Design a protein with these regions (language model features):
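Conserved PLP-enzyme active-site core in the AAT-like
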Residues: 1-202, 219
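Conserved C-terminal alpha-helix-loop-beta "cap" of PLP-dependent enzymes
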Residues: 188-233
């Protein structure tokens, strides 16, 4: 069972393994009160449970959270539903490797996910390609290593691995304080953008350091707005 907001690599994996996905709809925001009009909202716990109720033989539920725009699914509620149906919850947390640096539980592994993939290079200071796979059950480790041997390179980049270690060391040194300051700044900018009439992400759960602004209601495109910013330094 997968939400339609998944990454194309997951679709490719399903094709290679011959998996038959059951899609969970992710309706787009239709009103500014919901968020940026036209952007798909995260899958709801209710839609996931409806799919599980109809497909009780599902091997897993696959969710992307947070998405590219910073919108986050209710992972805690979805995890509770998945486990009630004896189904694994897999979370693509590519844009959320930093979420465990906040005092409130926000990382999928803190909220009940069974497997979770983080891209360390998106929001942490690591080289492109640095990633981590988290497992709630240590017994999954051998199967995960076998799968990685099939789909991964036999000549990994030691520079990437070193950058991952250095990024984690840096986050342990002052990551919590740095992320807290950044989240406060983003919160202030969201307020300024909203007061000026811009559409912003308004989902109940959202990435504290992601600032996504819609420009359609202002009569310009993101490209035009970007050029306007560049001209003003």
């Amino acid at each position: 069972i997968a939400a339609r907001t998944l990454h194309r690599s997951a679709v490719a994996m399903m094709g290679l393994l011959g998996l038959d996905p059951v899609w969970v709809s992710c309706p787009a925001a239709s009103r500014e009160e919901e968020g940026i009009v036209g952007i798909c909202l995260p899958p709801s716990p209710q839609s996931v449970e409806a799919a599980l109720r109809e497909h009780r033989d599902a091997a897993a539920v696959y969710i992307t959270s947070p998405d590219y725009f910073g919108q986050m699914a209710d992972i805690a509620a979805i995890a509770e539903i998945c486990h009630r149906y004896s189904t694994l919850l897999l979370v693509d947390n590519a844009h959320g490797a930093h979420l465990n640096l906040f005092r409130a539980a926000m990382h999928p592994m803190q909220l009940g996910a069974d497997l979770c993939a983080d891209s360390l290079h998106k929001n942490l200071p690591a080289l492109t390609g640095a990633a981590a796979l988290h497992m709630a059950d240590p017994d999954m480790r051998e199967e995960a290593l076998y799968a990685m041997s099939l789909f991964g390179s036999s000549s990994p980049s030691y520079l990437i691995m070193l950058s991952a270690d250095m990024a984690l060391e840096q986050m342990e040194g002052g990551g919590v304080e740095g992320m807290t300051r950044l989240a406060q700044w983003v919160h202030e900018q969201k307020g300024r953008a909203a007061r000026r009439g811009y559409q912003i992400v308004r989902t109940f759960l959202c990435d504290p350091i992601r600032l996504t602004v819609g420009f359609a209601s202002m009569g310009c495109t993101a490209r035009q707005f970007g050029e306007w910013i560049r001209l003003r330094g």
